[in-house]
Amino acid sequence: MSDETLVNDPVNPEPARPASAAMAPPIVASPAKRIQAFTGDPDFMTSLARGLAVIQAFQERKRHLTIAQISHRTEIPRAAVRRCLHTLIKLGYATSDGRTYSLLPKVLTLGHAYLSSTPLAISAQPYLDRISDQLHEAANMATLEGDDILYIARSATVERLISVDLSVGGRLPAYCTSMGRILLAAMDDTSLREYLGRADLKARTSRTLHDPESLFACIQQVRAQGWCVVDQELEQGLRSIAVPIYDASGQVLAALNVSTHVGRVTRSELEQRFLPILLAASRDLCHQLFG
């Protein structure tokens, strides 16, 4: 998502067009129906609820949407969607090319305050900083949010940044990331197959594993060994290793990883030098959180 120059909301409303296969499917239990359930509440702000629903209509795989597509996904009338988008543009949260709309990085600030202040993120930050200082690479923590991973804490040395540089609140697809596969490995087999059946599995590089059966076998291996390396599957040149963070009952709560460039760190070094540091940090953090 690039930071683009804001343009005015198109003056002419988009003409109606029939729903097609190219249009994103409506969200189950649509926002419009959930909003309608509060019509009897005099303190409920329908306009605010609609604005939030419009923001949530955008996904990693649907970054550019038309008014018709957003209306289809949310079941909110097009006129209301248009007003929401106009407001988001004026406030610096969205932009338009005259037909499609996309969110701007400023929208991440809406969730940053919460994510960075959760007990897990607060407790994890010193460990991430220590890992980053020790290994001179970016250290991250994420949870599973729908079909994506959601970054909840991060520490990165300025001189080592690579193009995949997500701030707290950023998202990436779970299937092709080391933290994502750790979190997917915590699912039972039925839930995992359901995920692989609905997720948009595509080759982001020539090395991306995107066949459902191959991914299922890979994630089962991750589950058995307790850690995961993803080597240039998300982005050419990007290599990462991840481990799980457990809660008091032994369930996977989040994932912790270090990402690096292939020109700096070999896969063997990831496993021999980075992995013990990550496992120790995971163990110490779990002990701090749950005793």
UniProtKB/Swiss-Prot annotation:
Domain HTH iclR-type per the UniProt entry, residue ranges: 45-105
Q: Where is the IclR-ED domain?
A: 120-291
Query: What Pfam families does the annotation carry?
Result: HTH_IclR (PF09339), IclR_C (PF01614)
Could you name the domain of life of the organism this protein comes from? Bacteria
Description of what induces expression:
By beta-ketoadipate.
Where are the residues of the annotated region Disordered? 1-22
Q: Which GO terms describe its molecular function?
A: DNA binding; DNA-binding transcription factor activity
Residue range(s) of DNA binding per entry:
67-86
Query: Which biological processes are named by the entry's GO terms?
Result: 3,4-dihydroxybenzoate metabolic process; catabolic process; negative regulation of DNA-templated transcription; positive regulation of DNA-templated transcription
Q: Which keywords are on file for this protein?
A: Activator, Aromatic hydrocarbons catabolism, DNA-binding, Transcription, Transcription regulation
* Keyword DNA-binding attached: yes
Biological role stated in the UniProt entry: Positive regulator of all genes within the pca regulon, pcaBDC, pcaIJ and pcaF. Also required for the chemotactic response to aromatic compounds.
Name of this protein = Pca regulon regulatory protein
Species of provenance: Pseudomonas putida (Arthrobacter siderocapsulatus)
